[in-house]
Amino acid sequence: MNVRNNTKLITINALLLAIGVILHQITPVLGLPMQPDFAITMLFIIIILNDNFKITMVSGTLMGIFTAMTTKFPGGQLPNVVDKIFTALIVFLFIALIKKSNILGRLSVEKRNNILMAIVLPLGTLVSGILFLGTAKIIVGLPASFSILFLTVVVPSVALNTVIGLVLYRIVEKSLRRASLL
């Protein structure tokens, strides 16, 4: 890959990370000290668009640090970092497994990525929520039981992230196509 393409790639990823952090910061809480995690949605978009392990892990680490700085959960800094890094790894491996199995083999890249987003958004958000709650429970404790927080925060977040994530993905994809960056 030449320097010009690397610069474009770095710039696009930085913008997507920034959008994720801004969405994470401005998203209101759902009546509990937790919120839907649209930062993870942007992380999934980065993973699908780049299909690169190093970029995935760097983006997961950076998103973890950024969301730790903007978390509204008391003591949620370390759980955010752990959650984003491991979620990025799990989602990357899941996507690699799907691609290796050739289930979506004959589809165009655009259709394949749309299907991957539709699968990854709910599953990845679920993994992220479980990792966050589990890590928070071990490190700082939870304000309510794990199961109550799972049902009242993680499950609604899965639904919200899936719907809004698909919309965000289409916006990002169309923008990158119009700019001839995809």
Curated annotation (Swiss-Prot):
Its main location: membrane. The keyword Nucleotide-binding does not apply. Pfam families: TrpP. The chain crosses the membrane at residues 10-32, 55-75, 119-141, 146-168. GO terms for biological process: amino acid transport. It is a multi-pass membrane protein. One of its GO terms (cellular component) is plasma membrane. Keywords: Amino-acid transport, Cell membrane, Membrane, Transmembrane, Transmembrane helix, Transport. It is found in: Cell membrane. Probably involved in tryptophan uptake. Belongs to the vitamin uptake transporter (VUT/ECF) (TC 2.A.88) family. TrpP subfamily. This is Probable tryptophan transport protein. It comes from Clostridium perfringens (strain 13 / Type A). The lineage of its organism: Bacteria, Bacillati, Bacillota, Clostridia, Eubacteriales.
